[in-house]
Amino acid sequence: MKIALDPFMIRHVPLLELPSVVAELGYEWIELSPREDFIPFFRHPRVDDGTVAKFRKALDSAGVGISSLLPLFRWSGPDEDARQAAVRYWTRSIQIAADLGVTSMISEFNGRPEEPDRSEAQFWKSMDELLPLFEREGITLTLEPHPDDFIENGYDAINLIRGINHPNVSFLYCAPHTFHIGDDAPGIIEYAGDLLTHVHLADAFDHTASSGNRYILNPPGTPARIHQHLDIGEGEVDFGELFGALRANGFDGTLTACVFAWEERAKESSLFMRKKIDEYLTDRS
């Protein structure tokens, strides 16, 4: 099992210094989410081959690996120009992963919930173009349902991934999305079975609680989604239940601490999350 850190809260650390900083926080693995000087959100990668080589050397020197790259592109459109651009961005990102020796990439479906049929059609078109590249480079792709996407429910995401019917494609369970994707960690984890290879760990409040008034959004009836990525214990996700389900399912993949809420105390949060993950892994009660 790998325990990784998503270093988004410390993304302002220079890229070549990042591995040593992550090592100091007690992690041996980085799940590298978007950052402006590497692979930014929804735009073409900003890094050249020389910097990729230097980054790989810095990782080796620090004794830290990249568990996964996590790019986010609009490969499900629904706009066709956006989809084609996303495929170009993906192509370069896959090459970067290969040059780093990374064998895992993670992403979302990245379509629109108000256009689910069009988004899914665009997703399949992109998969037809990109799956051969993943195969050629020996890279796996792990997908997660996300709030405000054309697939938000965990069971629906698993069914779609099964429909892809490819050994390189698997499922990610994101704990801070629990209350958006079905609020059924044990059921979703069991249903995923061997398709579950990655888990994101952070806490969140149940936005459906208190008759939907845990949060009050304006204007009334807005379709906006709300969630958090908090330290474990600060929200309402049942982590005892979640880790119990992972044990029952024989999970042996990658656990990633992905707290985004506390940039002002990012070091303390990252250290705390590493400790809590170890506690849950050793607690068999």
Residue ranges with predicted function:
Residues 2-5, 29, 66-69, 128-236, ...:
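Acidic/histidine-rich catalytic cores of soluble enzymes
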Residues 5, 22, 30, 59, ...:
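Conserved, mostly hydrophobic/aromatic
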Residues 12-22, 84-95, 181-189, 239:
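Short, acidic/polar
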Residues 16-17, 58-62, 75-173:
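Active-site acidic/histidine proton-transfer and metal-coordination neighborhood
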Residues 18-36, 101:
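Catalytic domains of carbohydrate-active enzymes, especially glycoside hydrolases
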Residues 31-59, 110-115:
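Glycine-rich, proline-tolerant flexible connector loops at the mouths of alpha/beta enzymes
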Residues 254-269:
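A short, acidic, flexible beta-alpha connecting loop/helix-capping segment that sits on the rim
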Residues 266-285:
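C-terminal helical cap(s) of enzyme catalytic domains, especially alpha/beta-barrels
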